[in-house]
Every structure is written in structure tokens, then in C-alpha cells.
Amino acid sequence: MEDDLYARIANIELQQAAIATLEPLRRIKIKEGLQKVLEENVGKENYDRNRLEQEIIFYIEKIDISEEQVRLKNHCEYFKDVLKENTISKGKKLSFILQEIGREINTTGSKAYDSDIQKCVVLMKDELEKSKEQILNVL
């Protein structure tokens, strides 16, 4: 069972690495998409480009997923550390850590606005659910 849980967390970490490679492209797509919508609705010359840059920065900060990714990485590491512990009663602790992992995955998904990142989130959720099922078998 431990090997299966390690594999599930490793799969979550693989998807997280994929998200890290997609993140810079997502920011560019968001910026270009906002600019295109603005130009289509207002015109190319009818807006202040400096103001647009400020608004784009604000928007990108609002949907930034870097904090969630850092916390997700930390939770995965903590999960593996607890899994290594040689104690009998680690099931509840692992269950709580999986809840935290789930929160970070869900927040990433809700902030992403990117289909490729959403695919990674779905795969991570699948691995998370399988991990929860394994833990429930122990409890």
C-alpha cells in the first residue's frame, strides 16, 4: 500500500511539474487575450497602454497560482515524510494532509483559466481520490 501511495503522490508531482512548464505560456495567453478583447471592443488607439499594463498585472496577480504550487509541493513532501514514519497511527495524519493537497489542487484549478492546466488538475484530482481511498482502507 505504501508503494501505491508513493506512486500516487509522484504522479501528482509530475502533473505539478507540467503545470510549472505551462504557467509562463498561460500568462502570455491571458495578456494577449485581454489585449485582443480590448482592441476589438474599444479600438487599438482608444485606450491607454500603460493603464492596460497595470490592469493586466493586477489580473495576473489575482489568478497567480505560484503560492498554491509552493504549498502543494510542501504538502506532498510532508505526506512522503509521514508515510516513511515508523508509527502505527499515521493514517489520520495522512488523511489530513491529503485534504490540504486537495485544497491546493482545487484552488489551482479554479484560478487557472487554461485548458492544459485544467487537464493536469483533473489528473491530480484522480490520483488524490485514489490516495484517499487507500487511506480509508487503513483507517
PLM ranges: what are they?
Residues 1-139:
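N-terminal intrinsically disordered, cationic/polar leader segments
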